[in-house]
Design a protein with these regions (language model features):
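Cytosolic regulatory regions of ion transport systems
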Residues: 1-124
Length: 124
């Protein structure tokens, strides 16, 4: 299997599992979160760890490799507003393949309407 580039935004338990699993498969992983301590926790297991607020399009736009990734995985489930703003920003920046974590049926419905490529529900 060829190595792919993934960006994971929102560094909680789901992101931790995904980063470890995808890294073990030989993929290139970048993580993004607004909390420096979370980013630091991930830094040793990924190729790039960035402190940025994904709800601010200008901050995402300043990360050149973001739009070159094969997939961007949004692991923000508990903060609906942050999840949706992040996805809208990614869409506006031209990210083609977005995978997003959903925390409820309503969240899933909105993600589908926004055109998210794949949706996962780790709490189910």
């Amino acid at each position: 299997m060829a190595s792919r580039q993934f960006v994971i935004i929102g560094l909680g338990n789901s992101a931790n599992y995904l980063a470890r699993h995808l890294t073990s498969l030989g993929h290139d992983i970048m993580v993004i979160d607004s909390h420096p301590e979370k980013v630091q926790d991930f830094a040793s297991m990924v190729s790039q760890a960035v402190v940025a607020d994904s709800t601010r399009k200008k901050q995402l736009a300043s990360i050149p490799s973001l739009t070159k990734a094969d997939s961007v995985i949004v692991c923000i489930g508990s903060n609906l507003e942050a999840s949706l703003l992040t996805i809208l920003n990614l869409k506006e920046l031209g990210v083609k393949h977005i995978i997003a974590k959903s925390s409820s049926a309503e969240h899933t419905s909105i993600l589908e309407k926004l055109g998210v490529t794949d949706i996962f529900h780790p709490e189910r």
